[in-house]
Design a protein with these regions (language model features):
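Short, low-complexity, polybasic intrinsically disordered segments
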Residues: 119-140
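Acidic-basic catalytic patches of nuclease active cores, encompassing PD-(D/E)XK
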Residues: 1-40
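Catalytic cores of nucleic-acid endonucleases
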Residues: 66-126
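Short, charged, intrinsically disordered terminal tails
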Residues: 9, 102, 131-135
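Active-site metal-binding core of divalent-cation-utilizing nuclease and nuclease-like domains
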Residues: 36-59
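Conserved catalytic cores of phosphodiester-cleaving nucleases, focusing on short active-site segments
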Residues: 30, 51-71, 90
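Residues at secondary-structure transition points
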Residues: 13, 17, 21, 46, ...
Length: 140
């Protein structure tokens, strides 16, 4: 969407449900790897940060893309939807998050860790079961 107001968020929109399912699976994936989820769905003027996580080394801003598999998987997975514009948008949202939330965030080392931008792509079957998860650390 360009400029202006963002469209109203319909809680019954199937895309919203799919996104929430994917974000939950991605959060569990990160937690299983030792990350603490410190924020979810942080709203900014540019959009919404999906997940913010931290461990002793990194503060990770994570973009999550979830798709339903229809037949045979194609050559491009969910992560193909993260183009140049989206990467720029996530960086801008991260700056906004840092200004608003970083002073209140608690980090194990006492100081903020190194910042990293990850991407997690999930493919689900028609019943919402996880078929594939791809996690790109330092994706952009």
């Amino acid at each position: 969407m360009r400029g202006g107001k963002q469209p109203r968020r319909d809680p019954d929109d199937p895309r919203r449900t799919l996104g929430a399912t994917g974000e939950g699976l991605a959060a569990r994936h990160l937690e299983a790897r030792g990350f603490e989820i410190i924020d979810r769905n942080f709203r900014t003027r540019q959009g919404e940060l999906d997940l913010v996580a931290s461990d002793a080394r990194f503060l990770v801003f994570c973009e999550v893309k979830t798709r339903i598999a229809h037949g045979e998987p194609g050559p491009l997975g969910p992560l193909a939807a993260i183009g140049v514009r989206k990467r720029r948008q996530v960086r801008a949202m991260a700056r906004e998050w840092l200004g608003a939330r970083a002073p209140d965030a608690r980090f194990d080392s006492g100081s903020p860790p190194e910042i990293r931008f990850d991407a997690i792509g999930l493919t689900l079957d028609a019943h919402g079961r996880l078929l594939a998860l791809e996690h790109l650390e330092g994706a952009f």
